[in-house]
């Protein structure tokens, strides 16, 4: 696991300057590039986002349910980002030479879900990538989308991205999802 920070120095900057949460601080990209090797199929990134509690509670169980389903994939070292926004995964994937970024992100707490986590998937991310190029799996938590079901959706989308070379609005999850599938 590699720990990095965004360019947002603190929570105030993170909230007032969203652009800083999308960029890596200092030489983090250079430090991550040391782990690029010959490239990776996917890079998993954990960003505290708007609810650190969400990723603290749900990132590990989702990864434990997902990673066994990705046997044979070249998976980059896990990166944990302090004060990170979704788009920071673009810079991280580029530094690690990863084809796909998966950002596990603490979603904005709502009245009924203070601990909801989202997974944002992007094929061939670049600094110019827009949100339209991302797929999102939201409300990952026991009271929402269960880890096993989220892992099925996540790995299905990853395989589809790799096969079709697209993500975001061009790629729909059009399969029927059954409990525990």
Predicted features along the sequence, with ranges:
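Glycine-rich phosphate/diphosphate-binding loop of Rossmann-like nucleotide-binding domains
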Residues: 52-73
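C-terminal functional extensions of proteins
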Residues: 107-181
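N-terminal low-complexity, intrinsically disordered segments
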Residues: 1-36
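Short glycine-rich or small-residue beta-strand-to-loop segments that form or flank ligand, phosphate
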Residues: 41-54, 102-104
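Active-site rim loops that border cofactor/substrate pockets in soluble metabolic enzymes
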Residues: 68-96
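Gly/Ser/Thr-rich loops at beta-strand to alpha-helix junctions
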Residues: 10, 49-54, 84-85, 108-111
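Glycine-rich phosphate-binding loop
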Residues: 90-117
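Short coil/turn connectors at secondary-structure junctions
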Residues: 37-42, 73-76, 97-100, 115-117, ...
């Amino acid at each position: 696991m590699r720990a990095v920070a965004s360019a947002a120095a603190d929570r105030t900057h993170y909230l007032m300057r969203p652009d800083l949460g999308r960029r890596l601080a200092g030489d983090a990209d250079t430090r991550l590039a040391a782990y690029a090797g010959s490239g990776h199929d996917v890079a998993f990134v954990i960003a505290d986002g708007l609810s650190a509690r969400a990723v603290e509670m749900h990132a590990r169980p989702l990864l434990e349910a997902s990673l066994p389903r990705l046997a044979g994939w070249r998976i980059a070292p896990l990166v944990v980002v302090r004060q990170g926004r979704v788009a920071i995964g673009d810079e991280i994937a580029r530094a690690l030479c990863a084809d796909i970024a998966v950002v596990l992100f603490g979603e904005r707490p709502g009245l009924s879900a203070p601990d909801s986590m989202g997974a944002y998937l992007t094929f061939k991310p670049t600094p110019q990538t827009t949100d339209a190029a991302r797929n999102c799996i939201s409300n990952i938590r026991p009271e929402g989308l269960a880890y096993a079901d989220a892992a099925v959706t996540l790995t299905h989308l990853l395989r589809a991205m790799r096969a079709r070379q697209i993500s975001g609005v061009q790629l729909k999850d059009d399969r029927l999802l059954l409990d525990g599938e």
